[in-house]
Amino acid sequence: MLNLIPAPRGSVHMQEGSVKLPETVTVSLGDFAPWCLEAFAARLDGHVETAENGFITLKKVDIAKEGYKLTVTKDGITVEAADESGVVWALTTVTELTAEGEALPIVTIEDAPHYGHRGLSLDCSRHFFTADEVKKVIDQMTRVKLNVLHWHLVDDQGWRIECKTLPLLHETTGTYYTQEEIGS
């Protein structure tokens, strides 16, 4: 039994055996944008490169929005998805599977979200978090496949966005995010 959060809504077919991720994981992007590898690469300490014949092959197919089919064999990994979000969720599952041990089980997982909107509300107007803390929250959201962040920045208790034309808005509440921090 696999301990995945959230549990896949589709099918999970386990087989005997396992495969280890190479030291540097190569990924064939296919028709997908490179940004969909960012969180995966960060979790593997940057040991991810794109290649024509990668250990992981991404294929664009007609399946549910944000859904994916992940196939792990001794020869490598295939991710089938309709969009970049599906790729992100599949690669999140790969990192979750490797967290259970050094090797990935030989498995095929079909998964798609039940709800299109899966989110978290972060009220930084009433309780300020640093930009680094917000980034950690976003990373944790990705790990459990949440796709919407409601970042509450303005209320009676505070104006948390730097406003260069009206600086008193943010200066009177003390702590705020610079425009550079918001952009990163």
Predicted regions and their residues:
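Acidic, contiguous N-terminal accessory segments
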Residues: 1-113, 118
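Feature activates predominantly on carbohydrate-active enzymes
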Residues: 63-184
